[in-house]
Amino acid sequence: MSDTSTGNGKVVVNRSMSLDGFIAGPGHAMNWIFDFMAPDAFPEIAAATGAMLVGRRTYEVGKRMAAGAERGSASSGEAYPFSGPVFVLTHEPPDPPDAAVTFLTGDIGEAVARARSAAGGKNLEILGADVAGQCLRRGLVDEILVYVLPVLLGDGIRFSSPGLARIDLEPVSSTRSGAVTILRFRVRK
């Protein structure tokens, strides 16, 4: 789906969203996503991704979901088919740190540059509302990929944070896979 043949991967905001515009439910709950899609539902996206930059809250939610999957909770238990470098942007790295990820503090532009460099010419996937908002405000995003799920959550974390200025998008594709509608937009710069 993404062109990485030039060796200049894109910065892609990637998120699942309820029909009423929420990317997470109350309490940052995201396990509802697995009611509609498995973590490995789109292997071509994982194959085009060279690195991920996530926010601390998204990282913590992911850890809780993975722990729940190991115990057989509502999460699917299937692994996301991505094994590249993961960067977590945070004000306070955990103590002790998680050896599986690189914690970054500081400027969003520097964080994107470092993670993009580690992506090896593939896409840098941005996860997390706050980090995505910072990237969008700074004009660092090339594409937005949205998986629209057939559910109304009613409350939670919105797709974009208040105060984000208008950003014009160019539709690239619209496809459907099972219950999921996949929308891809290019950010007009």
Label each region the model flagged:
Residues 1-189:
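Enzymes that bind and transform nitrogen-containing heteroaromatic metabolites
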